[in-house]
Amino acid sequence: MMQDPISDMLTRIRNAQAVRKKEVVMPRSKLKMSIANVLKEEGYIVDYREEGDSTKPQLVITLKYHEGESVISEIRRVSSPALQVYKSKDELPKVKNGLGIAIISTSKGVMSDRQARRLGEGGEVLCYVS
């Protein structure tokens, strides 16, 4: 059984980009769909979609490349099931001096650090993307 599905998602993305795959497939969950939505809104992936039936739903992410290089240079898990990292709206980190994003799980849903600051929300820091 998978202990940390978010780490698994990030690792699958990292590994697929390392071998220049166009798409990556993984088990689907609402949280993974929300993270994929933030990655799409911020321009780190081309698109995502659901596949499969209700017994084995899959999430398919279409990766984005620019001049042969992956748009995502680093994607790293911050909070984990063993050590959850929470930040208030004033403590939200700036990733690579604003060139990257932090994906935050707030009471209003999963969003980027910029959007959380705009809404005055803090929450669990899921990962950093740059």
Curated annotation (Swiss-Prot):
> Could you tell me which InterPro entries the record lists for this protein?
Ribosomal_uS8, Ribosomal_uS8_CS, Ribosomal_uS8_sf
GO CC aspect terms: ribonucleoprotein complex; ribosome
Q: Does the keyword Ribonucleoprotein apply?
A: yes
A single Pfam family it belongs to is Ribosomal_S8
GO function terms (MF aspect): rRNA binding; structural constituent of ribosome
Q: Which GO terms describe its biological process?
A: translation
Q: Does the record's keyword annotation contain Oxidoreductase?
A: no
Keywords, A to Z?
Ribonucleoprotein, Ribosomal protein, RNA-binding, rRNA-binding
Q: What family classification does the UniProt entry report for this protein?
A: Belongs to the universal ribosomal protein uS8 family.
Q: How does it assemble?
A: Part of the 30S ribosomal subunit. Contacts proteins S5 and S12.
The function of this protein is: One of the primary rRNA binding proteins, it binds directly to 16S rRNA central domain where it helps coordinate assembly of the platform of the 30S subunit.
Q: Report the protein name in the record.
A: Small ribosomal subunit protein uS8
Gene from which the chain derives = rpsH
